[in-house]
Amino acid sequence: MARLPTTELRKYLLTGQFTRRGCLHLRPSPLAPPIPPLRTLSTTPPTPSDQQPQIIPLRKQLKDQAKAAKLSGSPKKKLKKSDNQTVPGWDLTVGIEIHAQLNTPSKLFSPASTPSSSSDDAVHHHHPNTHVAPFDLAIPGSQPSFQPTTLIPAIRAALALNCHIEPISRFDRKHYFHWDQPSGYQITQYYHPFARSGSVTLYPRDGIAAEDGEQVTVGIKQLQMEQDTAKTLAQPNSTHYLDFNRVGVPLVEIITEPCIHRPATAAAFVRKVQMLLKSVDACTSGLEQGGLRADVNVSVKRTGEEELGTRTEIKNLSSFKAVEDAIIAERDRQIRVLEEGGRIEGETRGWSLGSMETRRLRGKEGEVDYRYMPDPDLGPVVIGGDLVERLGETMGMLPDEEVGVLMGRFGLSERDAMALMLMEGRLEYFYGVLEELERMLGVEAVEGGEQRHAMLAANWCLHELGKLAEAEEVGEAAAEEVTSQVPEQDLAAILFYLHQKKVTAKVAKDLLWDVFRGTIATGGVTEQIDSQDLWYKEITEADYAAIADEVIEGQEKVLQDFLKFKQGKSKAYPQGKLGFLVGKMMRAGPEQGKGMDPASAERVMRVRIEQVYLPRLEDAQ
């Protein structure tokens, strides 16, 4: 390791400043070539090669291996989700540990900034080993300095999970050796956590298993603050790169009671916790973005037995589906072992995307192996009741209350309300669009009813924007940031003109695409409609009738269905046939329906059929 210059050490000790280069990244010259993450560990000597092997991300390697395994195996009938929730004669018990990165500007025990708080990393690309301080790297002589601001999101998280906040908590050292923890121990709150005895209630809309009924309450044993570890980047030839930016980032560990008995309910719990933490701005990002990591403890026992079975732990599950699938796979493995007369060993297991079974990682370490002890360098954390009360008052609505508002006040379906809640940033975007739309509508927003405008805005925020993200010509990055490419004011302007019937639905969708592609500048929707003459000019009633007559000509067989209904020979009105004729009518109109209103077209078509063509058919009989 390069020696740390005394000038840099003095700056850090006296002013808390640390240079961007970091203490492991001292380059001799600004012209030096880029250097990969600097601590490289290899279990085998490198093989000389004229050509550097292509580096394939580990996640892609695992996906490719899983696909190959599926293709090589025999095809199996796909089970319904409900078929996998229970196994007759066996009881499943699951406990969950969730590690969530707290939304803080600094690390837990050093003034170094967290990667997520850095203003120059707006697109979430961070130079390796730049968000570090001497304590993060366990440099001799460096001491931990608890950063009080990290308490704020931690307390919010505990309140959102209905926990009791302990007035005094303490930090402990959890000893183990691994390359991602340079100090040889992790600082956590094993003996005296800052929050205990919480609960989360789940409902069918959260995705619980049908067997769990109308609601499930999951008990929270405790919440504890602790340090995150370095990020390990696996490379070919048993080589690992280490990025220490993540070391010391504050985490809150959420530990449940072993009270979950269905795989789908376990996944629903993790999803609900993510919603709760994000609603109070406690965590940086969600499970699939790496801000949360879930470990599950799985055990099975025969129905009727009192004592729980031996549990195994599955580490680092990175999606809600992975939580459910891994639990199902491990449950089935344990049942198979027990039915064959074997015994379950307490161990840590892993799970890969697309895999059909878990794999052994290592034997389970007991608490004695970690040698927990109070940290002598850190005093107790005292949390005042006034702070807890203040944070509770300013916390805002929690997800269940928010869903109630979306359904009751705005008239949204439960499905749409939950979709807005679950999609990253979509709920805030919806509120922004609705506020701008009602501003443009003015007094009409009150007279016309808030629900109608909210339902229109929600439909476009979910479904029409969803179509943009799913389109083949849209790249993955664009799909993830679709709301950032369609400003709230532009979508509100499109919906305003659509609501006022000044543009057709087809024109509105075309305008949305133009905004998304960037061919319309921000705030330029009205100018685009003017320049392209896209304003809706409805044709006359006589023109509607003439087009309807043109479409009906030669459709005697279709008209017979309407006649049968009129004569009582058919009980159901042929709405599908009416829609077929209206569709032909819209296509036969000027410029593919421009100037035609579908509702007016349907009304005229119905009148022409009932008042003109059916009497002719009856006379002909």
From Swiss-Prot:
Composition bias, Low complexity: 38-57, 110-120
UniProt EC number: 6.3.5.-
Mitochondrion among keywords: yes
UniProt KW Ligase keyword: yes
An annotated Gene Ontology molecular function: glutaminyl-tRNA synthase (glutamine-hydrolyzing) activity
InterPro entries: Asn/Gln-tRNA_amidoTrfase_suB/E, Asn/Gln-tRNA_Trfase_suB/E_cat, Asn/Gln_amidotransferase, Asn/Gln_tRNA_amidoTrase-B-like, GatB, Gln-tRNA_amidoTrfase_suB_CS, Gln_synth/guanido_kin_cat_dom
PANTHER family: GLUTAMYL-TRNA GLN AMIDOTRANSFERASE SUBUNIT B MITOCHONDRIAL AND PROKARYOTIC PET112-RELATED (PTHR11659), GLUTAMYL-TRNA(GLN) AMIDOTRANSFERASE SUBUNIT B, MITOCHONDRIAL (PTHR11659:SF0)
Subunit-level organization: Subunit of the heterotrimeric GatCAB amidotransferase (AdT) complex, composed of A, B and C subunits.
Sequence similarity: Belongs to the GatB/GatE family. GatB subfamily.
Protein name (database record): Glutamyl-tRNA(Gln) amidotransferase subunit B, mitochondrial
Origin organism lineage: Eukaryota, Fungi, Dikarya, Ascomycota, Pezizomycotina
